[in-house]
Amino acid sequence: MRLDRLTNKFQLALADAQSLALGHDNQFIEPLHLMSALLNQEGGSVSPLLTSAGINAGQLRTDINQALNRLPQVEGTGGDVQPSQDLVRVLNLCDKLAQKRGDNFISSELFVLAALESRGTLADILKATGATTANITQAIEQMRGGESVNDQGAEDQRQALKKYTIDLTERAEQGKLDPVIGRDEEIRRTIQVLQRRTKNNPVLIGEPGVGKTAIVEGLAQRIINGEVPEGLKGRRVLALDMGALVAGAKYRGEFEERLKGVLNDLAKQEGNVILFIDELHTMVGAGKADGAMDAGNMLKPALARGELHCVGATTLDEYRQYIEKDAALERRFQKVFVAEPSVQDTIAILRGVKERFELLHHVQITDPAIVAAATLSHRYIADRQLPDKAIDLIDEAASSIRMQIDSKPEELDRLDRRIIQLKLEQQALMKESDEASKKRLDMLNEELSDKERQYSELEEEWKAEKASLSGTQTIKAELEQAKIAIEQARRVGDLARMSELQYGKIPELEKQLEAATQLEGKTMRLLRNKVTDAEIAEVLARWTGIPVSRMMESEREKLLRMEQELHHRVIGQNEAVDAVSNAIRRSRAGLADPNRPIGSFLFLGPTGVGKTELCKALANFMFDSDEAMVRIDMSEFMEKHSVSRLVGAPPGYVGYEEGGYLTEAVRRRPYSVILLDEVEKAHPDVFNILLQVLDDGRLTDGQGRTVDFRNTVVIMTSNLGSDLIQERFGELDYAHMKELVLGVVSHNFRPEFINRIDEVVVFHPLGEQHIASIAQIQLKRLYKRLEERGYEIHISDEALKLLSENGYDPVYGARPLKRAIQQQIENPLAQQILSGELVPGKVIRLEVNEDRIVAVQ
């Protein structure tokens, strides 16, 4: 018999049988060796064949191994083993059986039939385990589905459904799928489409994270619970595993061969299987190379004939990009749109999946946490969908609580570090012999014993609390298993088991859980095991940088004295500081309009009066850093074409992928201060873009993504009307001054732009009394720089007065003061430090000498 007529799997098994014979020191390769190799072959046909025939493959393996151990062993064969006469006879019989069936190649399942028909040890073992020619022949027919073996790789295509799909109905029976809450309309629509005669293939389309895959899992659960029409009862839902289908397909045509195997197996099932293809768009173009047919085209005939019941799932963008372009594929699917659930529906979904997260993380998730996860994620996470983003919040909050439970509590950790510190000191003092050291050692020993006692008591308490928590989790896990068991009993109609669980085990476990929970509530001091709305807010703040947690007392006080904080840096300008402070307080108190930015202001005034400085002070107050603001110099946007830099270039232009300067900055940091400096210098088209930001708190970038501006403070500065402010300052009160300036502003900006700004703030010119305070603020920065180099500096009142007089200019504001400090203080100081006149460690005094500021030590 020619060995090249064996299929690939059979040839591999023969090589394995040779190795097995060598390993057992047998002189010949017996049928037993080959049968053992076939049984243990990964992805082989023999093991599933025997299972299909109702034979215990495990028992057969044991019997064959015992028979192998009884075979005669020969030492010094030198690695040369030959097939025995028995094996040659069985292989020839395989050839005969293959020819009878019209096969071009000999497949491994025929070896079992041939072994039964020939006499020998293997035939006796097979018959003892219940194998007969009749049941093996029937199992072979069932496996082949009326097909012949026409190529060497035929066996690789078998069991394709088992290799390349995941059985969702089986997972639902085992209770491994999360419960699906709501989505009744979408599941009903999917069932309606599946019940059609032709084109019975629904495709679920929706944004990422709305629960498309969950709908199919819900369908699988309904099928096993019998909550579907007669036409769908008993069906299996199989999810196609594209990763397994593509992985390892090295040669041209191998992928197509595997997919063809899946489609053939599905055809054999005669409509009893619903195939679920997640990320359906991956099928279009999969396996395509140099004009080869892709997976999408291979599916079309089966879909059109109704042989394949398929449910697809893909996102809106990918459906448009891949499926709609292929009209022939699109018409074979029926669209089922899956919308994002409302906040109320999301709360119901979260309540349904809550128990799974509690079991995994061993924590308790409170109802306020669930409500907070749904409402806060809906408001603050704009670029993702419910319920996915809310589930992620719950998951991460539970994970952080679990991490705290597993790690040592802070109180214990602090005591532990203190004990180590005291022990080190004790070791050092034991080497000393003087009286003071001995006295200190006695005191130290006393403190050490006290700390160790405290530590052991706390450790006991911590261990008891951990044990209490793990006890609760064990009961919860048992209760979950009991609920799965009652469902399984209900499906098979085992009433005795149902009553035993429903009226015996489950009430008992619930009673135990209630008792354990009460005990847990009383004793918990070191460990937190509850996820509350505060934890959800913490996680959200970490994700987005938006402070949504309840305000601590310190933050309340800080917000109430916000004006004083800002006045440390911005001198005068009370109206501007009040306007900004009130906007921030409204936002943190939850009174601001949720669909607009926190505040939008137009700062008007002469140069150098503190417009930009107030923005920096606000960023510092909110984020502890001057850099935490998006600063855009509008003088860069004077040309019409430069507007696209703010939101990103349109498709087809260079830089399209990079995104916009303004939109990208806000996407990365949604809670920020946006400063549009010198806004009147920008092109008028820029203001058209800003209208959406100021009114609705959103902006669409060049790639079509909506960017959320609702948590930003938008501040625009301008010099418009500054000449009026300079001229009439002192003559008019603030209200009249503002009215005059607004008249100038209305000539430069459109009414719809001014109308959308929360407040237009007019800055006063600075007086001499303000300049002295500003001089002190600027000198403090100089003192800080000198302190780092070891110099201490003081300025006399006369020197400060002279500096203020020299630095005051009503037209240019505070900027000339900076130049005065540079020329009159910094330049002479630099020379004296470099020449060695001023040395570190001694106080430098700045005094007036002949109308000049001099530094002396």
Curated annotation (Swiss-Prot):
Keywords: Acetylation, ATP-binding, Chaperone, Coiled coil, Cytoplasm, Nucleotide-binding, Repeat, Stress response. GO terms for molecular function: ATP binding; ATP hydrolysis activity. Residues 391-525 form a coiled coil. Pfam families: AAA, AAA_2, AAA_lid_9, Clp_N, ClpB_D2-small. Its main location: cytoplasm. Residues 3-146 form the Clp R domain. InterPro entries: AAA+_ATPase, ATPase_AAA_core, Chaperonin_ClpB, Clp_ATPase_C, Clp_N_dom_sf, Clp_R_dom, ClpA/B, ClpA/B_CS1. One of its GO terms (cellular component) is cytoplasm. The modification N6-acetyllysine is found at residues 96, 176, 640. It is found in: Cytoplasm. Residues 6-71 are annotated as: Repeat 1. Residues 341-545 are annotated as: Linker. GO terms for biological process: cellular response to heat; protein refolding. Homohexamer. The oligomerization is ATP-dependent. Belongs to the ClpA/ClpB family. This is Chaperone protein ClpB.
